[in-house]
Design a protein with these regions (language model features):
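Buried hydrophobic residues that stabilize the cores of well-folded domains
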Residues: 20-303
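Sec-dependent signal peptide recognition
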Residues: 3-10
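Hydrophobic h-region of N-terminal signal peptides that target proteins for export
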Residues: 11-19
Length: 303
C-alpha cells in the first residue's frame, strides 16, 4: 500500500513540476521588444490635414526584470488621465493591479492562479474596491502552454457577461476570436499571407469592419487600412482609414525610436466590395492627404 501511495505522490509531483513553468506571455514578447527594456516613453503627435497639431499623447511604461509591466501612465495634452500599477508575488505572477484615474476613481484588483486539469494556467482578477461604489466583478483568463491567452470569462455581480476564446495557428499567431455566447456567429477572423523575407500581410474581419495590415520582417507595421461595411444586405463599402508608416528609425537593439504616419485615400472610393478598394491600395491608385501623426519612443535598458 505504501508503495502505491509513494508512486501516486511521485506522479502528483511530476505533474506539478510539468506545468509550474507556465507563465503568461511577457509584454516584451507581445510588443516585440528587443533586449531587456526597463522603461519606454512613447510620445505621439496627431495632426490635422492643415498640418496643425491636433493632440499630443504620452505613455510611459515601466517593466520589471521578467518583462512584465510594473507601472504605466497615460497623458494627453499634458494632462495625466490614467495610472496602472502592478504588484507581483514571489513566483513572478501578478498579485495586485491598481488603476487610478486622478481625481475620479481608484480601482483595486486582486489576482490568483491555478492550473486546469489539462495543465493550462488559469488567472483570476477580482475587483476588490472602487472609489465610486463597489459591485462584484471578476475576469478569468486561461493561458495555453506557450503563455498565450486562449479564453476570457467576464463576470459582473455573479453573472457571466462575456466568454471569448482565441485560437492560434502553428506559428502562434491568432486566427480566430470566438464569442462563445453566440458560437454560430464569427466574432473575429484573421488571415495571414506570410512572405519569404519574414514579413506578412494580415487581414482581420469582424464587427462590420475589415482591416489590412502589412508587417515587415522586423515586426514593424508599414501599412494599415480600415474598410467599413454599412448594412447587412448589399452593404455599402467605404474606406475609413489608410495609413503608411514611413521614415522609421531604430536604436542599437533594433527597437523603433521614431516613425511618421501619412494618410491616403483611394482615387475611386465608390467600389462595391472591399477587395476592389484593397486592389486600388495595392496598385497604389491613391492620393496623399498628408502627415497624420508622428511617434517618438525612448528606451531605458536593464543591460
Amino acid at each position: 500500500m505504501k508503495k502505491y501511495c509513494k508512486l501516486f505522490m511521485l506522479m502528483l509531483l511530476v505533474f506539478s513540476y510539468s506545468y509550474a513553468g507556465i507563465m503568461p506571455e511577457t509584454e516584451w514578447a507581445k510588443r516585440k521588444l528587443k533586449g531587456k527594456v526597463k522603461s519606454m516613453v512613447k510620445t505621439e503627435y496627431g495632426y490635422e490635414n492643415s498640418g496643425k497639431i491636433k493632440f499630443t499623447s504620452l505613455v510611459k511604461t515601466e517593466f520589471n526584470e521578467n518583462g512584465y509591466v510594473a507601472r504605466e501612465s497615460f497623458t494627453r495634452d499634458e494632462v495625466e488621465y490614467k495610472i496602472v500599477q502592478y504588484q507581483f508575488d514571489k513566483n513572478g505572477f501578478i498579485a495586485k493591479r491598481i488603476e487610478e484615474v486622478p481625481q475620479k476613481s481608484l480601482n483595486n484588483y486582486k489576482y490568483s492562479y491555478k492550473y486546469s486539469k489539462d495543465g493550462n494556467l488559469v488567472e483570476k482578477s477580482e475587483l476588490l474596491e472602487r472609489a465610486k461604489g463597489y459591485y462584484p466583478m471578476y475576469d478569468i483568463i486561461t493561458y495555453n502552454k506557450l503563455g498565450k491567452e486562449i479564453n476570457e470569462l467576464k463576470y459582473v455581480e455573479g453573472k457571466l457577461e462575456g466568454d471569448v476564446s482565441t485560437f492560434y495557428n502553428e506559428r502562434g499567431d491568432a486566427i480566430e476570436v470566438k464569442n462563445n455566447r453566440n458560437p454560430d456567429y464569427p466574432y473575429i477572423l484573421i488571415y495571414y499571407d506570410y512572405h519569404k523575407n519574414g514579413g506578412y500581410e494580415k487581414t482581420v474581419d469582424g464587427h462590420g469592419r475589415r482591416s489590412f495590415v502589412l508587417i515587415d520582417k522586423n515586426g514593424f507595421q508599414k501599412e494599415l487600412a480600415y474598410i467599413l461595411f454599412f448594412g447587412s444586405k448589399n452593404p455599402v463599402v467605404q474606406l475609413d482609414t489608410y495609413v503608411k508608416n514611413v521614415n522609421e528609425k531604430r536604436d542599437k537593439y533594433g527597437n523603433i525610436t521614431e516613425f511618421t504616419s501619412i494618410s491616403y485615400d483611394v482615387l475611386e472610393n465608390n467600389k462595391a466590395n472591399a477587395e476592389d478598394i484593397y486592389k486600388q491600395l495595392k496598385e497604389q491608385k491613391i492620393k496623399k492627404i498628408g502627415i497624420s501623426g508622428k511617434v517618438e519612443i525612448t528606451y531605458e535598458y536593464y543591460d
